[in-house]
Amino acid sequence: MVLELVAMELKVWVDGIQRVVCGVSEQTTCQEVVIALAQAIGQTGRFVLVQRLREKERQLLPQECPVGAQATCGQFANDVQFVLRRTGPSLSGRPSSDNCPPPERCPVRASLPPKPSAIPGREPRKALTFNLRCPKLVPSPSIPEPAALVGPIPDGFADLQDLELRIQRNTEELGHEAFWEQELQREQAREREGQARLQALSAATAEHAARLEALDAQACALEAELRLAAEAPGPPSATASAAERLRQDLATQERHSLEMQGTLALVSQALEAAEHALQAQAQELEELNRELRQCNLQQFIQQTGAALPPPPPQLDRTIPSTQDLLSPNRGELQGVPQSHILVSSLSPEVPPMRQSSWR
């Protein structure tokens, strides 16, 4: 049940139903609001009004003013909520009002609406509005209002509620204290880890600084040596002599390469000349084979006695030339068996007679 101050009105959630109490002022006590709400819902028992701000709750005292308690919250006054809770049965041991008819409406209850009957399947009840002001109405003399509903709450009950509220507050504070102790332990662990990492980084920084100093000293020493070497020329170092030897070797290799290129050019020229000579010899050999076949054909024709047509003038001229050519080259062609192969392949009809003519 939630209460909210809007134009001197309090919005209350009673068992999941929002109700509005009108005519509330700064002098209206919590006890009056609770009695009015209990009479409106037609229930008896012990009720408490709880002030809720976000997730924190505080039980209001009977003589405390809800409007004043809400005003003390300042800018969070609109977020204040009041919850009406039933803590137990009535002290007088009066049976529940559900089993007996409700009392007649008195001047206090005259402004309150009657309790709605529970109808199955009906929609949830809307917010109900009632007024704490007492209109000038004559109460019904038939059934008087029970004194338990309008009587003040005993001081012992108020003290008990105060003690319960203190216990609840102490429990919440203990819970918060345990939470903050855990957070403190976590922060201390994080701080220790951060200090360890800081120490490691400091050690690494010192080590790198020492290495940088050593490298700077080494660089200064090398620069001094270079300056001394540049100012005082001395005997050539091993590097210079090695470079000179490499230059000489390169020059020698270049000369050898030039000589090899010249030799290769001469060899290529000789190869070309040999190729030309071989081609000329092959042509000459073909001409000799052709002339030899002509001679063999003439000899065969003469032996068989056939009339040989007069040779052309070119053939007469070529025969002496072939004989002249054969006479100096006969010694060169003695070991070559190609002439017989060429002569035997002259014609397919002539070979048997040619063999007889050679015999």
Swiss-Prot record:
Coiled-coil annotated residue ranges, if any: 180-208, 242-301
Annotated localization: Cytoplasm, Cytoskeleton, Microtubule organizing center, Centrosome
All residue ranges annotated as the Ras-associating domain in the record: 6-89
Primary residence: cytoplasm
An annotated GO BP: signal transduction
Keyword Nuclease attributed: no
SMART domains: RA
Keyword vocabulary terms for this entry: Apoptosis, Coiled coil, Cytoplasm, Cytoskeleton, Ubl conjugation
Domain of life: Eukaryota
Gene3D superfamilies from the UniProt entry: Phosphatidylinositol 3-kinase Catalytic Subunit, Chain A, domain 1
Biased composition (Polar residues): 89-99
InterPro entries, per the entry: N-RASSF, RA_dom, RASSF7_RA, Ubiquitin-like_domsf
Pfam family, one: RA
Record keyword Coiled coil present: yes
Role played: Negatively regulates stress-induced JNK activation and apoptosis by promoting MAP2K7 phosphorylation and inhibiting its ability to activate JNK. Following prolonged stress, anti-apoptotic effect stops because of degradation of RASSF7 protein via the ubiquitin-proteasome pathway. Required for the activation of AURKB and chromosomal congression during mitosis where it stimulates microtubule polymerization.
Descriptive protein name: Ras association domain-containing protein 7
Upper taxonomic lineage: Eukaryota, Metazoa, Chordata, Craniata, Vertebrata
